[in-house]
């Protein structure tokens, strides 16, 4: 399934275009990535979050 709706990170408007018609900024897909229980990169993403944000459990 291909997502069509996009959002401008600068002005926050939704559009179907690759470039925002209001401010000219490149738009991004407005949908979050699909969830999978077998996420092969989930461990690395959670570790990065703990290191950068300083939250969650600490590794020994």
From Swiss-Prot:
Gene Ontology molecular functions: snoRNA binding
InterPro entries per record = H/ACA_rnp_Nop10, H/ACA_rnp_Nop10_sf, Nop10_arc-typ
- Protein keywords: Ribonucleoprotein, Ribosome biogenesis, rRNA processing
**Gene3D superfamilies of this UniProt entry?**
H/ACA ribonucleoprotein complex, subunit Nop10 (2.20.28.40)
GO cellular component terms attached to this protein's record: ribonucleoprotein complex
The keyword rRNA processing is annotated on this UniProt entry: yes
Q: Name one Pfam family in it.
A: Nop10p
Q: Does the keyword Transmembrane helix apply?
A: no
Question: What does the protein in this record do?
Answer: Involved in ribosome biogenesis; more specifically in 18S rRNA pseudouridylation and in cleavage of pre-rRNA.
Task: Return the similarity comment.
Answer: Belongs to the NOP10 family.
**Listed name of the protein:** Ribosome biogenesis protein Nop10
What is the protein's species of origin?
Answer: Pyrococcus furiosus (strain ATCC 43587 / DSM 3638 / JCM 8422 / Vc1)
